[in-house]
Swiss-Prot record:
It comes from the Eukaryota. Disruption phenotype: About one-third of zygotic mutants survived to adulthood. They do not exhibit any loss of methylation imprints at ICRs in the brain and liver at 12.5 dpc. Double zygotic mutations of ZFP57 and ZNF445 are embryonically lethal and embryos show no gross morphological abnormalities but significant reduction in size and weight at 11.5 dpc, a phenotype more pronounced than in ZFP57 mutant mice with a more severe loss of impinting. This is Zinc finger protein 445. Residues 219-289 form the KRAB domain. GO terms for cellular component: nucleus. Transcription regulator required to maintain maternal and paternal gene imprinting, a process by which gene expression is restricted in a parent of origin-specific manner by epigenetic modification of genomic DNA and chromatin, including DNA methylation. Acts by controlling DNA methylation during the earliest multicellular stages of development at multiple imprinting control regions (ICRs). Acts together with ZFP57, but ZFP57 plays the predominant role in imprinting maintenance. In contrast, ZNF445 seems to be the major factor in human early embryonic imprinting maintenance. It is found in: Nucleus. InterPro entries: KRAB, KRAB_dom_sf, SCAN_dom, SCAN_sf, Zinc_finger, Znf_C2H2_sf, Znf_C2H2_type. The lineage of its organism: Eukaryota, Metazoa, Chordata, Craniata, Vertebrata. It comes from Mus musculus. Residues 52-134 form the SCAN box domain. Keywords: DNA-binding, Isopeptide bond, Metal-binding, Nucleus, Repeat, Transcription, Transcription regulation, Ubl conjugation, Zinc, Zinc-finger. Residues 433-460 are annotated as: Disordered.
Length: 986
């Protein structure tokens, strides 16, 4: 705000006392950052009056065109009406008040405007009160016929016709003069002589004119001077400030042309010297005491309360420029005004002393916003002494930017007697840095400061707002750190200091600039222009380091640059899908070392758990060995083996004695151990058939003996209704019925294929798992064809012949053909075979088994019924466990026992006299199973449904098996397998 008088508008002062944010301008060595507050939410009546008159007196010829005229009118009306603060009713009241004042007589309008009414009701109240004081005499305008209405000067360029003529006098002035008093109790003459709390436009000093005073003395520059409050000045933009500057200078020129030459005011000197919005003004702030009187009363001024908010050298320069006359006038907002003469001796920060002239009445020393300071009541010599010259470097601007810092009272920077800041001198002045603390230790928000900090820049306290954060002065966004707020406010200012010298594109942030430079670095790498591309108003060339120039490793696929070779190699793995880290235990591969290390930790945990289990097992085994050595008190006299229990010793001795105390009542078989006897009895029950006519059970050899009746009912209750097959468990019956109902309850979630048995579903799901496993892992030793075969329905593939298998066990058995390994060995002749079924066929030679045919029924090992096989297993288990012939294996014992059983059956069948035994003998001989699946085309029958489906392909000519290499189709899977071998060999 330019220096000038401050009018004490009550609303403006209330807004300042409420702690409105101030405009802060931070000047740096290379530039400054401007941070402006939001619009004040309070009213300033003088400012509104100014914009009202500007709005009314605007002429069309003053603008360059209709659009500019309209926009200017809209802006002036907005500042007059203030729609952001006032409501519609209040704005309407302003229009009515203006019209009401315009139709009043000149005398009454002048007197009413001195009271600054805010509404029409206040004007009516003032007029009625004045009319009562005049004993009912109605007020008339005596100047209506003689002189035009009084023009309020101070808003636009003054014309000679607009000057108040002193020749016009009021009628009945003697009667009216006794009653025209202000609300503060000050006479009208005193008000016009000393009033600084007047509206924005002052009234000419008509009432204090004497008869002998000349015409030119009726008008001064103070009458046309208009100032703003600090908040309103901060809300003005550059165009509005230019308008204010032009109007004030033009008014001053008109006053000089009419009145004559006079001392140039400080406001005019300041406006002519520099722009009002780009610099900091020399500031002398009066420290106001908490005991100050309210508005309108006298302010108790205490001496030694001035604080200079600027360096002494800057203060001297500003005072020399602005102080033209030796008279210096310092006034306070309340309108009290005194003159004083003082000598000031200022010493600069570097030690040079400068003698200033006497400051007399006439010049202004004001704040940067133009507010006048209070008059000193003493004539003491003003002496400022800067304690120390502080040199601020570019890297450390904390002292320069350290606003709102609290100083510790014990520090030499604080003096409780003379105020805050640097060390106080004899006259009580101290230079400080806007600490925001009052004399009583409270900050500007009225809160007591609890934290104290050193004045050193390294021990500064962050300046927080009322919410504890740094708020943006434009949009109100809060930040935790002041640097973030400054960075954010660059968005509102629109400053883009980082400019590219190649394409002249500008950026607000250095990070965006560096990203932009990468586009040029691909085209012109190594160019000298790249080093000098950072051009801005600030010195930020140190941001470009050698690290940016060292990025010479370039990826050909994605265009990324790297400064280190190891980073580039790791980046290439993304494109090549290389996984160099391989686990030696599970053969898993990894692309990054971190993933491999994380995976190895899992193995280490497993090994640790396994080792711990082994240690626990060894420890428990050692403890058991210690216990067993003590408890083993029953030794065997034949072999020396010891036992902990006598029962175990008795069972062991049966081996040496050959005792078999357990005998089967059905077949007469004896057993050494009770467990073997129980197993035999369970298996014997499966070999028993029910004889309906006698209610007895018939053994397969022909023996008949009674059994409990519950067995017949249990077996008959779980009988298949389709084929009549009986089951002991109902769950087995339900599983069996799926063969007839074709039900497939097990469905795959991935391909929705259904299966009848859960084992088939499990085998099918393994294909999906292997498909995912081998899909992205192609072995280096196999070709693309081999990898496709691995992904096929049979993932286990033989590398020798190309044959595929669904199970790994089948593949291992198949590999024995190529390797020549013979794992199946006969215990009698020590002959080995590569297949198990070949060993079984070979062992028939040792059993001397001769299959025989009787009519269409085959009696032998290949035609045994299920009951005979189960019974033979029972006999074999007893014979194999306790036989003295160590040379016979399990399979051989089964064949020998079945041979004896078959001999007995043949003898019974050869005897034609015994019809019952013949029927019993052939009762257990299985007949040929009937084919139940018939082809509807040719009438051919099949035992299995799968065979029927394969047969139908002959009629439909369907070829479902397709080669994934050449696309050839086949009818049978065996043909496709044979065909795939040719591709593998090629």
């Amino acid at each position: 705000m330019p220096p000038g008088r401050w009018h004490a508008a009550r609303s403006a002062q209330v807004s300042r006392e409420q702690g409105c944010l101030r405009m802060v301008k931070e000047e740096e060595e290379d530039g400054y950052i401007s941070m402006q507050t939001a619009r004040p939410q309070t009213l300033n009546r003088p400012g509104q009056e100014l914009f009202r008159q500007l709005f009314r007196q605007l002429r069309y010829h003053e603008s360059s065109g209709p659009l500019e005229t309209l926009s200017r009118l809209q802006e002036l009306c907005r500042w007059w009406m203030r729609p952001d603060v006032l409501s519609k009713a209040q704005m309407l009241e302003l229009l009515v008040l203006e019209q009401f004042l315009s139709i009043l007589p000149g005398e009454l309008r002048t007197w009413v405007q001195l009271h600054c009414p805010e509404s029409g009701a206040e004007v009516v109240a003032l007029l009625e009160e004045l009319q009562r004081d005049l004993d009912g005499t109605p007020l008339k305008d005596p100047c209506l016929t003689q002189n035009p209405d009084v023009h309020w000067i101070g808003t636009s360029a003054l014309q000679p016709a607009q000057i108040w003529s002193p020749a016009s006098h009021l009628k009945n002035s003697s009667a009216l003069e006794d009653h025209l008093e202000t609300s503060h109790g000050i006479g009208i003459c005193d008000v016009l002589a000393e009033q600084t709390d007047s509206p924005a436009v002052s009234v000419p000093d008509y009432f204090q004119l004497e008869e002998g005073i000349e015409y030119q003395e009726a008008l001064t520059f103070q009458d046309v001077e208009v100032t703003f409050s600090q908040e309103e000045w901060g809300c003005l933009n550059s165009a509005q400030r230019n308008l204010y500057r032009d109007v004030i200078l033009e008014n001053y020129g008109n006053v000089v042309s009419v009145v004559g030459s006079s001392p140039k005011p400080a406001l005019i000197s300041w406006l002519e010297a520099r722009k009002p919005w780009g610099v900091n003004i020399c500031t002398v702030q009066l420290k106001r005491d908490a005991d100050a009187a309210p508005e309108g009363g006298k302010l108790q001024i205490k001496p030694n309360k001035f604080i200079l908010k600027q360096k002494p050298s800057e203060y001297i320069e500003a005072c020399v420029k602005t102080s033209v006359s030796p008279e210096t006038s310092v006034s306070e907002e309340t309108g009290l005004k005194e003159s004083f003469k003082q000598k000031s001796r200022l010493q600069t920060s570097c030690g040079d002393s400068i003698q200033m002239k006497e400051m007399k009445e006439g010049a202004d020393i004001s704040q940067r916003t133009g507010r006048e300071s209070e008059v000193l009541r003493n004539n003491d010599i003003l002496e400022l002494k800067h304690v120390k010259c502080v040199s601020v470097s570019r890297k450390r601007l904390s002292f320069k930017h350290g606003y709102d810092r609290n100083f510790r009272k014990s520090s030499h920077h604080y003096n409780n007697k003379y105020g805050e800041g640097l060390r106080g001198t004899g006259e009580g002045f101290g230079v400080y840095q806007n600490t925001g603390l009052k004399e009583n230790g409270k900050d500007r928000y009225g809160e007591t400061s609890r934290k104290s900090w050193h004045a050193h820049p390294e021990h500064r306290q962050p300046s927080y707002s009322e919410e504890g954060l740094f708020q943006c002065r434009v949009c109100g966004k809060a930040f935790k750190w002041r640097s973030n707020r400054i960075r954010h406010e660059k968005i509102h200012t629109g400053v883009k200091p980082y400019q590219c010298s190649l394409c002249e594109k500008a950026f607000q942030r250095l990070s965006s600039y560096r990203l932009h430079q990468k586009t040029h670095s691909k085209q012109k790498r190594g160019s000298s222009k790249y080093k000098n591309a950072l051009t801005c108003s600030l010195d930020v060339s140190h941001h470009l380091t050698d690290r940016d120039e060292r990025k010479h490793l370039h990826c050909n696929q994605c265009g990324k640059n790297f400064s280190c070779k190891s980073y580039a190699i790791e980046h290439q793995r993304i494109h090549t899908q290389e996984k160099p880290y391989k686990c030696t235990r599970c053969r898993k591969t990894f692309r990054w070392k971190s993933n491999f290390s994380r995976h190895m930790k899992l193995h280490h945990k497993e090994v640790y758990k396994q080792e711990k289990r082994q240690e626990d097992f060894k420890q428990s085994y050692r403890q058991s060995q210690v216990i067993s050595t003590v408890e083993k008190t029953f030794p065997c006299q034949n072999c020396g083996k010891t036992f902990t229990q006598k029962k175990s010793l008795i069972e062991h001795q049966r081996i040496h004695t050959g005792e078999k105390p357990y005998q089967c009542s059905g077949c007469g078989e004896t057993f050494t151990y009770r467990s073997s006897y129980i197993i035999h009895m369970k298996r014997t029950q499966h070999a028993i058939k029910i004889k309906p006519e006698h209610g007895c059970l018939t053994f397969s050899q022909g023996a008949v003996f009674p059994i409990p009746r519950g067995s017949h009912n249990t077996e008959g209750s779980n009988k298949c209704k389709y084929c009549g097959k009986a089951f002991h468990n109902r769950s087995f019956l339900l599983i069996h019925e799926r063969v007839h109902t074709r039900e497939k309850p097990y469905q795959c979630r991935e391909c929705e294929k259904a299966f009848r048995w859960s084992s088939n579903l499990y085998r099918h799901q393994r294909k999906h798992f292997l498909h995912k496993r081998y899909k992205y892992r192609e072995s280096k030793e196999t070709s693309n064809l081999q990898s496709k075969i691995l992904i096929d329905q049979k993932p286990f593939w033989c590398q020798e012949c190309g044959k595929t298998f669904t199970r790994k066990r089948s593949l291992l058995d198949h590999k024995g053909i190529h390797s020549g390994e013979r794992r199946f060995k006969c215990n009698l002749c020590e002959k080995s075979f590569d297949r198990n079924y070949r060993l079984v066929n070979h062992q028939r030679i040792h059993t001397t088994e001769q299959p025989q045919w009787r009519d269409k029924d085959f009696v032998g090992i290949h035609a045994r019924s299920v009951d005979q096989r189960k019974h033979s297993n029972t006999l074999q288990s007893e014979y194999g466990l306790h036989s003295d012939k160590p040379g016979l294996s399990y399979c051989q014992d089964v064949r020998l026992n079945i041979q004896e059983l078959s001999g007995k059956l043949r003898k019974e069948c050869d005897n034609p006299s015994d019809e019952s035994s013949k029927s019993i003998a052939f009762q257990n001989v299985p007949t040929k199973k009937k084919a139940c699946h018939k082809c509807s085309t040719c009438g051919k029958t099949f035992k299995k449904h799968s065979h029927l489906i394969s047969h139908k392909r002959c009629h439909t000519k369907e070829r479902p098996f397709k080669c994934i290499v050449c696309g050839k189709t086949f009818r049978w899977s065996s043909n496709l397998t044979r065909h795939m071998k040719n591709h593998v060999r090629n």
